[in-house]
Amino acid sequence: METRPPAAPAKLSYGIRRGGWTRIGAATVAAGKKAAGDLDPRHHHHRVTHGGDGGGVGGGGSGGQEEADEQQQQQHDHHRLLQLHHHQGVQQDQEPPPVPVFHLQPASVRQLSGSSAEYALLSPMGDAGGHSHHHQHGFQPQLLSFGGVGHHHHLHQFTAQPQPPAASHTRGRGGGGEIVPATTTPRSRGGGGGGGGEIVAVQGGHIVRSTGRKDRHSKVCTARGPRDRRVRLSAHTAIQFYDVQDRLGYDRPSKAVDWLIKNAKDAIDKLDVLPAWQPTAGGAGAGNAAAPPSSSTHPDSAENSDDQAQAITVAHTAFDFAGGGSGGTSFLPPSLDSDAIADTIKSFFPMGGTAGGEASSSTTAAQSSAMGFQSYTPDLLSRTGSQSQELRLSLQSLPDPMFHHQQHRHGGGGGGGNGTTQQALFSGAANYSFGGGAMWATEQQAQNQRMLPWNVPDPGGGGGAAYLFNVSQQAAHMQAAAAALGGHQSQFFFQRGPLQSSNQPSERGWPETVEADNQMSHHQGGLSPSVSAAIGFAAPGIGFSGFRLPARIQGDEEHNGGGGGNGDKPPPPSSVSSASHH
């Protein structure tokens, strides 16, 4: 039992093992030794008797079995270390084929196996060096899991003898480019991260830097308002642009654009210079009140949003009524300036001092300015609270065909009774806001109340087409109009009601108001301007006060105070008020 072969041929019993996961028997060990030849005795302490020795010696068979059992026990003890150090069983002179171990690519295993001779030289003290080798990998197993083999070689570089480290270092470097992409990639990201970040910055995207990404979403102020810095090109234009950029050799699109602008400077200088801020330049709209507004302001606002464009188109369609009388000249009063518009825009909630008969000329000017400003910036107007702004431009739909037909049927004269009544129905919005209609202009100019924009064609050619319900006169106007239009007017309001999505209580208030006005219209068929004005200020109507919708005119108690003829309120106020508050 004491007979053992020399140390040279019996070093590694598991040297031929694939992957270090299966246990081998005595016959497998013998076959492996025959195939592998002499093994390095420094790799292992276990000595296994050769199969031939077992046959020659009487107890060779049992001795071989004991050695096999001992070997299996040792393998079981070192099973975990074998998993971490899968090179241990590789021969010095013969390399096993690549085996995927620890989820490494075959190339990495091939590299590891290529350095097996090195590992044999790195463990001159037998198991001591081997165990230290194991522990080194045991402390850093995660490096193996994601390709940290380059670090694996560097560990040996410090533990090896003076000569092998040079070979280890060389092979480690060679393997670093092939099997250590994970370790070198983070370094290239970190060390080359500065370079990578610079490359991204050169390309103009600042993709690496979050601030750069946010910066790309910023806007710039232009002649037509804030615009996104990013520009979307059509496919054909983008191809041409990038071709120019590549031919110029620029790495940033902005550089190519700068080059194009510089070379086209002569042609650009020939173009007209745009004003600094087009939407707030209300004077331009005032100068082009009669016909040009659609051509001058509509395209500018239309580029901002499609919804705005549609609303503007409708608005200009209604505002083009200014063909008769002073409607065109006073479409936008001279008082429409940037300050008035700014004040109008800033007032997101209604102001109490601008209601009722106490409305001053400046208030009227601001209101008229808001009304005119609405013609080309409905979005801004719809979000303001001054006068008619919170009444929403959702009412600016296309003119109702039925009502348009009724207008021509009832108001064909333009200045007759029905025409005047319909002008009253539209509360003389264009009359005193835009100066249309000779008789109503003077009386209603001082009573410019919160007007509900409503785009309906000009009933008589002089002007009250663009807006419905000067709240100060809405009830009286509707009363007279209801008599002229009959029950159809009630249907008209029912059809128009849903358009006022943000003011639902008023939808119910309008028809009932019209019905109540129908009764009163029999007694007040012909309303003089003064009477209608008085009734208008005290009328119940569908006063719009901010975002709550009382059925009073602007909230008579809130805004009208004691002026404007509160004592002249007709009976309908209570009924309409209760109806609109449900």
Swiss-Prot record:
<feature type="region of interest" description="Disordered">
    <location>
        <begin position="548"/>
        <end position="582"/>
    </location>
</feature>
<keyword id="KW-0217">Developmental protein</keyword>
<feature type="domain" description="TCP">
    <location>
        <begin position="213"/>
        <end position="271"/>
    </location>
</feature>
<keyword id="KW-0805">Transcription regulation</keyword>
<feature type="region of interest" description="Disordered">
    <location>
        <begin position="123"/>
        <end position="195"/>
    </location>
</feature>
<keyword id="KW-0804">Transcription</keyword>
<keyword id="KW-0539">Nucleus</keyword>
<protein>
    <recommendedName>
        <fullName>Transcription factor PCF5</fullName>
    </recommendedName>
</protein>
<feature type="region of interest" description="Disordered">
    <location>
        <begin position="283"/>
        <end position="306"/>
    </location>
</feature>
<dbReference type="GO" id="GO:0005634">
    <property type="term" value="C:nucleus"/>
</dbReference>
<feature type="region of interest" description="Disordered">
    <location>
        <begin position="402"/>
        <end position="423"/>
    </location>
</feature>
<keyword id="KW-0010">Activator</keyword>
<dbReference type="Pfam" id="PF03634">
    <property type="entry name" value="TCP"/>
</dbReference>
<feature type="region of interest" description="Disordered">
    <location>
        <begin position="30"/>
        <end position="78"/>
    </location>
</feature>
<dbReference type="GO" id="GO:0003700">
    <property type="term" value="F:DNA-binding transcription factor activity"/>
</dbReference>
<keyword id="KW-0238">DNA-binding</keyword>
<dbReference type="GO" id="GO:0043565">
    <property type="term" value="F:sequence-specific DNA binding"/>
</dbReference>
<comment type="subunit">
    <text>Forms homodimers and heterodimers with PCF2.</text>
</comment>
<comment type="function">
    <text>Transcription activator. Binds the promoter core sequence 5'-GGNCC-3'.</text>
</comment>
<feature type="compositionally biased region" description="Gly residues">
    <location>
        <begin position="51"/>
        <end position="64"/>
    </location>
</feature>
<dbReference type="InterPro" id="IPR017887">
    <property type="entry name" value="TF_TCP_subgr"/>
</dbReference>
<dbReference type="InterPro" id="IPR005333">
    <property type="entry name" value="Transcription_factor_TCP"/>
</dbReference>
